[in-house]
Amino acid sequence: MSRYVFTSESVTEGHPDKICDQVSDAVLDALLAQDPSSRVACETVVNTGLCLITGEVTSNAQVDFIHLVRNVIREIGYSGARAGGFDATSCAVLVALDQQSPDIAQGVNEADDHSGDPLDKVGAGDQGIMFGYACDETPELMPLPISLAHRLARQLAAVRHDGSLSYLLPDGKTQVSVVYENDRPVAIDTILISTQHTSEVEGISDENGIRERITQDLWTHVVEPATADLPLKPNREATRFLVNPTGKFVVGGPQGDAGLTGRKIIVDTYGGYARHGGGAFSGKDPTKVDRSAAYAARFVAKCLVAAGLAQRAEVQLSYAIGVAKPVSILVESFGTGKVTNDELTALVQDHFDLRPGAIIEQFKLRQLPQQRGGRFYQDTAAYGHFGRPDLKLPWEDVTDKASTLLQAEAQQQKQGSSL
């Protein structure tokens, strides 16, 4: 019997890097909402008293970027007396956006393909490799450690926003260690929560007293509600529960650490449980395959698992800049497949159109901000891009395609047995 512990982390929306992801995606939303053909590569930097947005944009949209940035920062919770050295109203906002390089644009606008299919004319915006993953550990077909870490981070933010724990401040991190036996989760070994807080907590000022109070409150108001509907729950006696191990966490957010777009790519995906191609998502329009193809790879992997063709599936895609069709497609089922990896790969090649133009069209990636009232990508920028039933993400809706795959596999097996 194999036994091991696997750990994943998440962060709250007030973490400096996540502030940047949300600002970058808010810029993307604003541009696509007005001009769905906008080309966007927006990077954000924050530190004490400063937010800088930079990158490349080609768009007909007219956006007040400074007003937009301040609204995002304010919504996260950095405003007024509780801003902690980074205030939406008073921080400097610098905008340094250029136009997209014409050399990149020509490859996307007119792919190196001479077929009559218009989708063949939309080339990948860059070279790269992307991975998608799914497994049957949770209802949303995500690995349990990252799913739990996100649940805790969302609940931590929720009790701050609703005032249940009024001493909490925006910055925070969660980490969950899960015990596996024979590759199945059997227990929650450790939960770690680091959360920013006021210098006094409900009249308590000594460090030990503050930590004891926060520990008690977080178990009651965060851990228990976040895990209440799960079959595998933490146990107050058996699960190690660590809170602010350094003792206190008063200075946080951009006052404590600089933040940058794209530095939480493992939090955004599978918590380290699956491989990652290295490309970040936030601030990038759908022609960037770092984003759109990673969404498609997740869709494919989830379809395979939802169809019962594998308990675990990892899909690798690769692209060349200016070329529409993927350079390669590979499926790995880690020995859990109903059929071989080669057969799974063949099913994917036959039933999924993974050209960038087709991915964009299938998921309506350019239209989503307009369809969702001017805001879509910003909400994916915190608490993960996958396994989010709260957001109704199109790449998570696999019911119809999974059924098609199952029928195709059954037909394939029937034909094979008749030979």
Curated annotation (Swiss-Prot):
Q: How is the cofactor bound?
A: Binds 2 divalent ions per subunit. Binds 1 potassium ion per subunit.
Entry's EC annotation: 2.5.1.6
Q: Which UniProt keywords apply?
A: ATP-binding, Cytoplasm, Magnesium, Metal-binding, Nucleotide-binding, One-carbon metabolism, Potassium, Transferase
Q: Does the keyword Nucleotide-binding apply?
A: yes
Q: Which residues bind ATP?
A: H15, D171, G172, K173, K248, F249, D257, R263, K264, A280, K284
Cofactor annotation: Mg(2+); K(+)
GO cellular component labels: cytoplasm
- Output the InterPro entries linked to this UniProt entry: ADOMET_SYNTHASE_CS, S-AdoMet_synt_C, S-AdoMet_synt_central, S-AdoMet_synt_N, S-AdoMet_synthetase, S-AdoMet_synthetase_sfam
Q: Name one GO molecular function term.
A: methionine adenosyltransferase activity
Q: Which pathway features in its UniProt record?
A: Amino-acid biosynthesis; S-adenosyl-L-methionine biosynthesis; S-adenosyl-L-methionine from L-methionine: step 1/1
Where are the residues of the annotated region Flexible loop?
100-110
Question: Which Gene3D superfamilies does this entry report, sorted A to Z?
Answer: 3.30.300.10
Residue numbers binding L-methionine = E56, Q100, D257, K288
Which positions bind Mg(2+)?
D17
Q: Name one GO biological process term.
A: one-carbon metabolic process
PANTHER family found in the cross-reference section: S-ADENOSYLMETHIONINE SYNTHETASE
Which HAMAP family does the entry link to? S_AdoMet_synth1 (MF_00086)
Tell me how this protein assembles: Homotetramer; dimer of dimers.
What is the documented function of this protein?
Catalyzes the formation of S-adenosylmethionine (AdoMet) from methionine and ATP. The overall synthetic reaction is composed of two sequential steps, AdoMet formation and the subsequent tripolyphosphate hydrolysis which occurs prior to release of AdoMet from the enzyme.
Name of this protein: S-adenosylmethionine synthase
Species name: Prochlorococcus marinus (strain MIT 9313)
Q: What gene codes for this chain?
A: metK
